[in-house]
Design a protein with these regions (language model features):
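Sec-dependent signal peptide recognition
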Residues: 2-10
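N-terminal signal peptide c-region/cleavage motif recognized by signal peptidases
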Residues: 13-15
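Beta-sheet-dominated interaction scaffolds and their linkers
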Residues: 18-42, 148-160, 192
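Asparagine-centered strand-capping/turn motif at beta-strand->loop junctions
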Residues: 41-45, 165-171
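Short, hydrophobic/aromatic beta-strand segments
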Residues: 47-55, 175-180
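Short, basic/aromatic beta-hairpin or loop at an interaction surface
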Residues: 58-68, 177-181
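Intrinsically disordered, low-complexity Pro/Gly/Ser/Thr-rich segments with frequent PxxP/GP/PP motifs
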Residues: 63-97, 185-212
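Terminal connector regions
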Residues: 95-146, 212-234
Length: 234
């Protein structure tokens, strides 16, 4: 009896890839005044790849039978990419009436690499397991008229606490914080976190933060790199 299994693997974000299908960035910015943006999808594997693309507004790892409806159009929605070749994926906003104009919006770009199934399987592929790999990447829709993104961290405040700290993001941007250290340069975060625009979050810490402590914070910029800023705990 011949058995073929198709398994799905999910990744919230990817910073490195084995040979296979991968985009040219780990995150994308869609300015409101742009007609569209593009992502270059490359196939570094030895086999042709069949790839499906879509956007979703949440961070769910579930793969549903019906794709979510979004105000964006992706062209093409599915493509075949030969080994060593690439595909330009075009993302275009069709209707912005439902998107907030006073803050950045987060969408997830899904790239599903579907392995081809041989019609005449060999002995090597008999009873084999095939993996369809879904990778997810952040896409930020950025309305015109927002304050300078480079000054967003200046609008983040940190309130002292014993087991957790309160972080207020008064900026209209998403801010991903990967590390917070005190004067002794020891990491106090259990894990990285992303601040929603104009939000307040309670973040667990490994040690107490007292009022007046100088914090050194690492956050991810538009290019996927880590940059630091400082703040004083209130």
């Amino acid at each position: 009896m011949k058995l073929y299994l198709l398994l799905f693997m999910y990744f919230i974000s990817a910073f490195s890839f084995a040979d296979g299908v991968s985009p040219d960035s780990t995150r994308y910015i869609y300015p409101e005044d742009a007609r569209d943006i593009t992502a270059l999808i490359s196939n570094e594997s030895a086999n042709a790849a069949f790839v499906q693309y879509w956007l979703d507004p949440g961070d769910s790892e579930e793969l549903t039978a019906k794709l979510p409806v979004t105000p964006f159009e992706l062209t093409p929605p599915i493509s075949r990419i030969n080994p060593g070749s690439n595909q330009t994926l075009r993302i275009r906003l069709m209707d912005k009436s439902t998107i907030p104009a006073d803050r950045e919006s987060l969408w997830w770009l899904n790239v599903l690499d579907i392995p081809p199934v041989s019609k005449t399987p060999s002995a090597e592929t008999k009873d084999s397991v095939q993996l369809a790999v879904r990778s997810r990447f952040k896409m930020f829709y950025r309305p015109a008229g927002l304050s300078d993104r480079n000054t967003a961290t200046q609008q983040v405040t940190f309130q002292s606490g014993s087991h957790s700290i309160r972080v207020n993001n008064n900026s209209p941007y998403h801010i991903t914080i990967t590390e917070i250290t005190l004067a002794d340069k020891k990491q106090i975060l259990h894990k990285s976190f992303m601040l929603q625009p104009k939000s307040r979050s309670e973040i667990a810490v490994k040690r107490a933060v007292t009022r007046g402590d100088r914090l050194i914070i690492s956050n991810i910029n538009d290019y996927g790199g880590n940059v630091t800023f400082t703040a004083t705990a209130e």
